[in-house]
């Protein structure tokens, strides 16, 4: 499970150092792809495979599924962190997420999200106002 928020920097070669606490789960391989709200999703290879299987068995007659799958898979890039825990984010994915230097890497349960620092701050400020109200809608009776 991925938890917490970290603030690594993207280097000039487009590499990002993963937080130490995330490395063990990602060291066997990972997949980076487009996420919602212009962030990137990073999945351990096993989790990406599970998602792929779910999408593979879904009916291709559903246009929304075809559209989502095309974007999700065509933007995906597999990688293995180097010995320093760095991954290379391909230029098209960096452009999509607006990643230049300052980044935020968030644990999001079964995935990691990579955000441009300013975009994350804006998103978080927008969500803070409704966060307290969301729990009852999203998790009724759980929290």
From Swiss-Prot:
Q: Where is the SpoVT-AbrB domain positioned along the sequence?
A: 5-47, 76-119
Q: Which CDD domains match?
A: MraZ_C (cd16321), MraZ_N (cd16320)
Cellular component annotations (GO), alphabetically ordered? cytoplasm; nucleoid
Entry keyword Membrane: no
**GO biological process annotations for this chain's record?**
negative regulation of DNA-templated transcription initiation
Q: Does the keyword Transcription regulation apply?
A: yes
Task: Tell me the InterPro entries matching this sequence.
Answer: MraZ, MraZ_C, MraZ_dom, MraZ_N, MraZ_sf, SpoVT-AbrB_dom, SpoVT-AbrB_sf
Gene Ontology MF annotations: DNA-binding transcription factor activity; transcription cis-regulatory region binding
Pfam families named in the record: MraZ (PF02381)
Q: Where in the cell is it found?
A: Cytoplasm, Nucleoid
Major location, coarse class? Answer: cytoplasm
Q: Which PROSITE patterns does the UniProt record give? A: SPOVT_ABRB
Family, per entry: Belongs to the MraZ family.
Q: How does it assemble?
A: Forms oligomers.
Protein's UniProt name: Transcriptional regulator MraZ
According to the entry, what is the taxonomic lineage of the organism?
Bacteria, Bacillati, Actinomycetota, Actinomycetes, Frankiales
């Amino acid at each position: 499970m991925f938890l917490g928020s970290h603030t690594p920097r993207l280097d000039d070669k487009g590499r990002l150092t993963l937080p130490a606490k995330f490395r063990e789960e990602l060291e066997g391989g990972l997949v980076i792809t487009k996420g919602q709200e212009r962030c990137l999703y990073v999945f351990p290879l096993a989790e990406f495979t599970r998602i792929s299987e779910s999408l593979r068995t879904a009916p291709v007659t559903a246009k929304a599924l075809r559209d989502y799958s095309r974007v999700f898979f065509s933007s995906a890039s597999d990688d293995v962190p180097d010995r320093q825990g760095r991954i290379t984010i391909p230029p098209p994915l960096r452009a999509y997420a607006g990643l230049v230097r300052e980044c935020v890497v968030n644990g999001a349960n079964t995935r990691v999200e990579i955000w441009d620092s300013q975009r994350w701050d804006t998103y978080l400020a927008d969500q803070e106002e409704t966060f307290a109200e969301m729990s009852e809608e999203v998790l009724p009776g759980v929290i």
